[in-house]
Amino acid sequence: MNTPAQKKITIVDTTLRDGMSSVSHQFTPQNVADIARGLDKAGVGTIEVAHGIGLGASSIQYGFAAATDPDYVRAAVDAVENADIAALYVPGIATLAELQKAIDAGIKTVRVAVHCTEADCGQQPVEWAKEQGLTVMTFLMMSHKLDPEPLAEQAAKLDSYGADVVYVVDSAGAMVPQHAGDRVAALRQVITADIGFHAHNNLGVGIANALTAAENGATFIDGSLRGLGASAGNAQTEVLAAAFERAGWDTGVDLFPLIDTAEHIVAPLMKEPQIVDETALILGYAGVYSTFFHPTKRAAKKFGVPARDILMELGRRGVIGGQEDMIIDVASELAGRTYETPALAGS
């Protein structure tokens, strides 16, 4: 009697990129090597490494990292035996020269991230990276801001440029499972590239969103050990591995080495537990980009305005990544008038 083939999912780990945001980009190359080695031993096939915002982001605006991106990449490359090392490239922050340095340091995969309405901005780096022989994964950031069909139209552009994988990216942690499933299903109807899903956990449903995305056609799922990541953090790699296995999926990774790496290497490096606090929750509820988390907390303290009110107003204005300067504008405006917590547009 034949049995159906087990469903397969590929877990990509971003502890050493998105997780950098939780430690103020202060992982050392030795930390990177130790974590990458543990992930590699667990069978994780792709490990993303860079400043938390991506290549070239170490700056006064986004925070200075403890080392350079090439130093981080080399540390990871030297530590692994089987895994590919990837880096995040955001047009407008990184340059192709910085991507070339990452290639020289040993990356095999690049992840090109564009705002969900701006797939055109990915054409040059995607095509250039393919010419260099890289595997190219692409991110449609803030995917909650587009309905499924328009999002699929943007995905089709990235597919046409040669992307190997197109990700639905919940940058704000604003999605619930139906949102994740509907968007992935829409992409599956129009693109031939593989589909990925990148969750943030602001509404506490990062794992559920990832499972639903997979059931609707995603074959690449991002996670980070201990959930390390911007604001409320990402779907937790070791929990993803356990949940997918329980749901009947073949992840190709070994759960116990993942847990050991999370527990004994990552946890001692954490500045604080990765939790859904008030600011993280409202950030997801308001649909604001995850990098606004710490600057909003600082502005709230400086201006004596509740962080949630700042975030609700930013959500009403529809801000996106790169508009962090709006935080100060909104905080100062709210501090100068009598206000009530603003409602979301359309609510």
Swiss-Prot record:
Q: Which reaction does it catalyse?
A: (S)-4-hydroxy-2-oxopentanoate = acetaldehyde + pyruvate
**Organism in which the protein naturally occurs:** Rhodococcus opacus (strain B4)
- The top EC class is lyase
Q: Name one GO biological process term.
A: catabolic process
* Ligand binding (Mn(2+)): 18, 198, 200
- UniProt cross-references to Pfam families, sorted A to Z: DmpG_comm, HMGL-like
Q: Carries keyword Metal-binding?
A: yes
Domain Pyruvate carboxyltransferase span(s) in chain numbering? 9-259
What SUPFAM superfamilies does UniProt report for this protein, alphabetically?
A: Aldolase, post-HMGL domain-like
Name the chain's protein.
4-hydroxy-2-oxovalerate aldolase 4
UniProt keyword Metal-binding present: yes
Q: What family is this protein classified in? A: Belongs to the 4-hydroxy-2-oxovalerate aldolase family.
Q: Where is this site: Transition state stabilizer?
A: 17
Binding residues annotated for substrate, in chain numbering: 17-18, 171, 198, 289
Q: Name one GO molecular function term.
A: manganese ion binding
EC number from the UniProt entry: 4.1.3.39
Q: Which domain of life is it from?
A: Bacteria
Write the record's keywords in alphabetical order, separated by commas: Aromatic hydrocarbons catabolism, Lyase, Manganese, Metal-binding
